[in-house]
């Protein structure tokens, strides 16, 4: 397969990652009374932050939405890199490397703090990026 194909596959997986993350909003997993109590405490305790009043829930929910925005951005950028790879894939190797390292670290963080689905998505994207890197050095990428 060609570099552009691996990058576009990574883009599609990233888009699915974005869809999964975004449809999971508000990212609360528990329905037990203790879980609900924690969520309500996150919503009710406000504190000043740089001149505005925020809660832990505001940060939790806001960061979740921010992650969705950046996931969509990554999907679009990976797709665009796939298009660029058709003309000069070798020049994309430094960019592919940066994305590869970021997704490997994302997988590690997923293992440490989250659950299997984001880990699998990050690993699949890392594999695609690794293969894109390897094929980008060849002439007919």
What name fits each language-model region?
Residues 9, 13-16, 63-66, 95-98, ...:
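Physicochemical signature of membrane-embedded alpha-helices that form the seven-helix bundle of GPCRs
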Residues 2-3, 75-92, 137:
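Juxtamembrane helix-break-helix junctions at the cytosolic face
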């Amino acid at each position: 397969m060609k570099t552009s194909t691996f990058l576009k596959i990574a883009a599609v997986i990233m888009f699915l990652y974005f869809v999964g993350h975004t449809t999971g909003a508000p990212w609360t997993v528990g329905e037990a009374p203790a879980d609900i109590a924690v969520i309500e405490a996150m919503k009710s305790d406000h504190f000043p932050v740089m001149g505005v009043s925020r809660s832990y829930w505001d940060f939790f929910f806001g960061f979740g939405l921010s992650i969705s925005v950046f996931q969509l951005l990554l999907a679009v950028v990976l797709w665009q890199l796939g298009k660029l790879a058709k003309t000069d894939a070798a020049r994309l190797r430094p960019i592919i490397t940066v994305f590869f390292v970021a997704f490997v670290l994302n997988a590690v963080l997923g293992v440490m703090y989250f659950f299997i689905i984001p880990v699998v998505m990050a690993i699949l994207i890392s594999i695609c990026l690794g293969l894109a890197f390897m094929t980008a050095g060849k002439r007919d990428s």
